[in-house]
């Protein structure tokens, strides 16, 4: 089986994440896509939202997708999340499968500063997608580039729009938007 893994905070998951997953199905011909929410990312703060809420939103986003699943290995392990450890966890579950680690070009730019990058590229197929740059970045690490569309939205922009009372309709899966509204998530002062 061919499995793509997409790690992130998903704070919140939005249509850019879902659109990328669909493009990965097409370009990589994967059988399964695993969304892996991080517990405590190394280079990012997750503010004012519980792990429970982030997972609930992810479940709502993938509920009608037959090839998309959530793996909570980083949540279960707790603490700071390193990709090399996440990969070890996934490879223990999917011993005989081809694993594709998908990262954005914004992260790939600093990939050599990650914990054990050599071990990562030895363990999985590294796939880079466009998030910021339209041109391909050069690296000493073996990787594959996907010529995906850059989707000009981010979770931080969505949080900001909600705090400011601006519309976010159609930027989020409908059930995720409803969950955010029903639980007053990302509202300023909360």
Curated annotation (Swiss-Prot):
SUPFAM superfamilies: Nucleotidylyl transferase. GO terms for molecular function: ATP binding; nicotinate-nucleotide adenylyltransferase activity. It catalyses: nicotinate beta-D-ribonucleotide + ATP + H(+) = deamido-NAD(+) + diphosphate. It comes from the Bacteria. This is Probable nicotinate-nucleotide adenylyltransferase. Pathway: Cofactor biosynthesis; NAD(+) biosynthesis; deamido-NAD(+) from nicotinate D-ribonucleotide: step 1/1. NCBIfam families: cyt_tran_rel (TIGR00125), nicotinate (nicotinamide) nucleotide adenylyltransferase (TIGR00482), PRK00071.1-3 (NF000840). Catalyzes the reversible adenylation of nicotinate mononucleotide (NaMN) to nicotinic acid adenine dinucleotide (NaAD). HAMAP family: NaMN_adenylyltr (MF_00244). The gene is nadD. Signal peptide: none annotated. Gene3D superfamilies: HUPs (3.40.50.620). Keywords: ATP-binding, NAD, Nucleotide-binding, Nucleotidyltransferase, Pyridine nucleotide biosynthesis, Transferase. CDD domains: NMNAT. Its EC number is 2.7.7.18. GO terms for biological process: NAD biosynthetic process. Belongs to the NadD family.
């Amino acid at each position: 089986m061919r499995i793509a893994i997409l790690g992130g905070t998903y704070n919140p998951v939005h249509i850019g994440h879902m659109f990328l997953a669909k493009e990965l199905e097409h370009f990589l011909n994967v059988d399964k896509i695993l969304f892996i929410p991080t517990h405590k990312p190394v280079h990012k703060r997750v503010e004012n939202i519980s792990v429970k809420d982030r997972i609930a939103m992810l479940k709502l986003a993938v509920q009608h997708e037959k090839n998309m699943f959530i793996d909570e290995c980083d949540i279960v392990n707790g603490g700071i999340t390193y990709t090399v450890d996440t990969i070890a966890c996934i490879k223990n579950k999917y011993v005989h499968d081809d694993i594709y680690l998908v990262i954005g070009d914004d992260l790939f730019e600093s990939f050599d500063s990650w914990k054990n990058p050599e071990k990562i590229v030895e363990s999985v197929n590294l796939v880079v997608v466009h998030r910021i740059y339209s041109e391909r970045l050069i690296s000493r690490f073996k990787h594959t580039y996907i010529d995906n569309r850059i989707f000009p939205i981010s979770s931080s922009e969505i949080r900001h729009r909600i705090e400011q009372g601006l519309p976010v309709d159609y930027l989020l899966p409908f059930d995720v938007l409803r969950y955010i509204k029903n639980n007053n998530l990302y509202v300023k002062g909360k």
